[in-house]
From Swiss-Prot:
Keywords: Cytoplasm, Lipid biosynthesis, Lipid metabolism, NAD, NADP, Nucleotide-binding, Oxidoreductase, Phospholipid biosynthesis, Phospholipid metabolism. GO terms for biological process: carbohydrate metabolic process; glycerol-3-phosphate biosynthetic process; glycerol-3-phosphate catabolic process; glycerophospholipid biosynthetic process. GO terms for molecular function: glycerol-3-phosphate dehydrogenase [NAD(P)+] activity; NAD binding. SUPFAM superfamilies: 6-phosphogluconate dehydrogenase C-terminal domain-like (SSF48179), NAD(P)-binding Rossmann-fold domains (SSF51735). It comes from Xylella fastidiosa (strain 9a5c). Catalyzes the reduction of the glycolytic intermediate dihydroxyacetone phosphate (DHAP) to sn-glycerol 3-phosphate (G3P), the key precursor for phospholipid synthesis. It catalyses: sn-glycerol 3-phosphate + NAD(+) = dihydroxyacetone phosphate + NADH + H(+); sn-glycerol 3-phosphate + NADP(+) = dihydroxyacetone phosphate + NADPH + H(+). InterPro entries: 6-PGluconate_DH-like_C_sf, 6PGD_dom2, G3P_DH_NAD-dep, G3P_DH_NAD-dep_C, G3P_DH_NAD-dep_N, NAD(P)-bd_dom_sf. PROSITE patterns: NAD_G3PDH. GO terms for cellular component: cytosol. This is Glycerol-3-phosphate dehydrogenase [NAD(P)+].
Length: 346
């Protein structure tokens, strides 16, 4: 049931933040969107469009926008953060002193903290303190399709069931399904790794390696998610759901995926700098590939596809050499016997 008195502040006026703010505003929640770009905020507040990130899509009249963070979160019942991973820590540090006691924070950011490789829930808990209700929103969702009202399903994971359900309720509607769970680690892992794996599938498509190669890479990429999840305390069923498999399939096959487009350009022989410049928005995989491999190396888990992507994005090897190395790997069983067993290590 919708609580019409519930005020929501959405932080981040990029494509995803705008899409989520428009979604909850259409569900009759008083919603204010915060962003740094004055031009973007003015276009939303006056013309009802985000001309930079979601051009030609009209936004609801009830959605307000501001560049004043304090004004955005004042009186908010909860906050939804939708900034790139590189801005996550800074945004929370600015947010923390402005929050009233008991105000929950959810985020739709995907990735790890750059530099440290920490999960975002670890960053949030450290900055916001031990009592703040926290949740992560993830799953297969292109911002443009959400804003157009096309059918979408996501999942919200958190340790506080009441807050998790509150976030899901605000998003859930006739064309947008929001499921719930309590595996924050698994939800964050899937959302981060799929960006890295999408680069590999994009490279294969750019090199015209065929649909068989695409399917094989997606499946083996899912295997890498499961291998890492087994040693960090995540549950395999989370990775087999919307947070893992669902997001992986969308990001690896959808032409709206920036990470897939990056890989496709590299597979066609374009330079990394030119490909990023043409995309024109943040491509999370460039940073996240380092953090995924940091996690893998810390836990002694082999992730050959992710490792190859990191090497390509560091420009240590060519995309062709990366694919050749993957195909030359020794034959082995498809799954380790302990992969789906609880409390096991790889």
């Amino acid at each position: 049931m919708i609580d019409s008195k519930q005020k929501i502040a959405v932080l981040g006026a990029g494509s995803w933040g705008t899409a989520l703010a428009a979604l909850v505003a259409r569900h009759a929640y008083p919603t204010i969107l915060w962003g740094r770009d004055v031009g973007v905020i003015q276009s939303i507040d006056i013309q009802r469009q985000n001309f930079r990130y979601l051009p030609s899509i009209m936004l609801p009249q009830t959605l307000r926008a501001t560049t004043d963070l304090a004004a955005a979160v004042s009186g908010a019942d909860w906050v939804l953060v939708a900034v790139p991973s590189y801005a996550f820590t800074e945004t929370l540090r600015r947010l923390a002193p402005l929050l009233s006691t008991g105000v929950g924070v959810a985020w739709a950011t995907k990735g790890f903290e750059p530099g440290s490789g920490r999960f975002l829930h670890e960053v949030a808990r450290e900055i916001l303190g031990g009592d703040a209700p926290l949740a992560v929103v993830t799953g297969p969702s292109f911002a443009k399709e959400v804003t157009l009202g096309l059918p979408t399903a996501v999942t919200v994971h958190g340790e506080y069931a009441r807050f998790t359900q509150m976030v899901a309720n605000a998003m859930h509607g006739p064309m947008f399904r929001a499921y719930t769970g309590n595996d924050v680690i698994g939800a964050e892992l899937g959302g981060a790794m799929k960006n890295v794996l999408a680069v590999a599938i994009g490279v294969a498509d750019g090199m015209q390696l065929g649909m068989n190669a695409r399917a094989g890479l997606i499946t083996r990429g899912l295997n890498e998610m499961l291998r890492l999840s087994a040693v960090i305390g995540a549950r395999p069923e989370t990775l087999m759901g919307l947070a893992g498999l669902g997001d992986l399939v969308l990001t690896c096959t959808g032409d709206l995926s920036r990470n897939r487009r990056l890989g496709f350009a590299l597979g066609r022989g374009q330079s990394l700098s030119d490909a990023i410049r043409e995309i024109g928005q943040v491509v999370e995989s460039v940073q996240t590939s380092d953090e995924v491999m940091r996690q893998a190396e810390q836990h002694g888990v082999e992730l050959p596809i992710s490792e190859a992507v990191r090497a390509v994005l560091r420009e240590e090897i060519t995309p062709y050499a990366g694919m050749k190395a993957l195909l030359a790997r020794e034959q082995k069983p498809e799954y380790l016997d302990i992969l789906f067993k609880a409390n096991s290590s790889l």
